[in-house]
């Protein structure tokens, strides 16, 4: 029996890394693997526990077929190791921190994937992005405007194939909704 590919997407600052870290032990209890992405940024960079590689290393890995999925976003390259296909074939559920812009290509390769869109109230997201200190306020405002359009388009375009998790409140609540969705499906936890 094949496992499920669970594709977590959401804007920068929505709390994807925090959600994955908080849910990790309970996901492991369910036999769900969380994929460690390969990213062309320093392994010491703040954020997720990704494998940091140089752009040259990434290009070599990609040419050698090391990735099941790969994409570029925000000036970086992201890769999902090919081993996820072995895990899925063995019946394991696999959770990927994915890309909203790469969703169509991912759905093409994995038509039965479960898409989880992590959202957050715009005011909360603004505060999180400001607190990170990576961008100027004008860039943050532009990002927020793009995010609002992108989220609306995603929800309109994917409807029943997309489960929305609101991460504006306590993280523990979002973890419970995530687990409910994985255990019981979309409709049980809407």
Curated annotation (Swiss-Prot):
Pathway: Metabolic intermediate biosynthesis; 5-phospho-alpha-D-ribose 1-diphosphate biosynthesis; 5-phospho-alpha-D-ribose 1-diphosphate from D-ribose 5-phosphate (route II): step 3/3. SUPFAM superfamilies: P-loop containing nucleoside triphosphate hydrolases. One of its GO terms (cellular component) is cytosol. GO terms for biological process: 5-phosphoribose 1-diphosphate biosynthetic process; organic phosphonate metabolic process. ATP binds at residues 10-17. It is an enzyme of class 2 (transferase). One of its GO terms (molecular function) is ATP binding. Catalyzes the phosphorylation of ribose 1,5-bisphosphate to 5-phospho-D-ribosyl alpha-1-diphosphate (PRPP). This is Ribose 1,5-bisphosphate phosphokinase PhnN. It comes from Pseudomonas fluorescens (strain SBW25). The gene is phnN.
